[in-house]
Amino acid sequence: MDSSPVSARFDIFEIYRRFCAIRSGQQLCNKKPCDGEESQRFNLSKEAITQLLYLVENKFQARNSIFDELFKLMSRLDLMVDFTEFTCFYDFVFFMCRENGQKNITISRAITAWKLVLAGRFRLLNRWCDFIEKNQRHNISEDTWQQVLAFSRCVHENLEGYDSEGAWPVLIDDFVEHMYSILGPNKDTSLFCKCGDTESESCLYQEDEHHKDYRRPHTGLRNIPGLKRKTSKKNDEEEEDEDEEVLETQNSSSLLNFKRIKTSNSPRCSSKSPCSIERSLSQGFASLLSTGDKP
């Protein structure tokens, strides 16, 4: 190993700094059509990554020490707050796990890396790693590596938030099928309110501890590119149907509390729930009041 002063200064922090700078240039080129100059810049970025990988392989001849270095770097970065920083670090881990110029990384190295960087972030991490260890026969590509991060952000323990029509790698689709076979028909329905009372609507939502600027359904669903928001579309259609029913009721009587009727017509409302009984009583009173107005 080269023990020169230059090599000694080329530690994990410097490697990470250079990697992030190169990736920033690549992402900038990817966001807009590349002209001749931009295309040349992109090619230079690819060459820079190749050269950086060569330096890494010379610096860390004992490849097992890479995870010690990554852990040291991870403890110094503010990854819990800045997700952009974490995404760059996550890609950097894949880069550091590459060997002999290969574009993919080995299964054992990928599993070790996932357990390092996704601990506390991926609810199905242990099941995922067990599945990969037992079923995967090929090395992990960079695209699959990045898709696993997206999957970890949008899918809950009960697989709510997973879109079977999404552009997931086959490996992730196979994992989901495997999880369905384990979970069976029993779904956790306790996450959804069955009373239909709008004042109790808060039971349908939970605040995300790291993203408190919005409220989201407690399904683990994130607003990320490529994820089809089927649930939101379905809810919008249900709300339109409810609004039409409210307007019809308004034409028959102006004495009703339309908000409560709309609530009781919610698909989440049980036929024997308090709001369902209240709706029947309200309709009965409306009929009586309407009859009483006649001369």
UniProtKB/Swiss-Prot annotation:
Disruption phenotype: Root growth resistance to the anti-auxin p-chlorophenoxyisobutyric acid (PCIB), which inhibits auxin action by interfering the upstream auxin-signaling events. Also resistant to the auxin analog 2,4-dichlorophenoxyacetic acid (2,4-D) herbicide. Residues 237-247 have a biased composition (Acidic residues). The keyword Nucleus applies. A motif (Nuclear localization signal) lies at residues 214-221. PROSITE patterns: DCUN1. Residues 214-251 are annotated as: Disordered. Its main location: nucleus. GO terms for cellular component: nucleus. Keywords: Auxin signaling pathway, Nucleus, Ubl conjugation pathway. GO terms for biological process: auxin-activated signaling pathway. Pfam families: Cullin_binding. It is found in: Nucleus. Residues 1-180 form the DCUN1 domain. InterPro entries: DCN-prot (IPR014764), DCN1-like_PONY (IPR042460), PONY_dom (IPR005176). The DCUN1 domain, also known as PONY domain, mediates the interaction with different cullins. May contribute to the neddylation of all cullins by transferring NEDD8 from N-terminally acetylated NEDD8-conjugating E2s enzyme to different cullin C-terminal domain-RBX complexes; neddylation of cullins play an essential role in the regulation of SCF-type complexes activity. Regulates responses to the synthetic auxin 2,4-dichlorophenoxyacetic acid (2,4-D) in roots, probably by modulating the SCF(TIR1) ubiquitin E3 ligase complex-mediated proteolysis. This is Defective in cullin neddylation protein AAR3. It comes from Arabidopsis thaliana. The gene is AAR3.
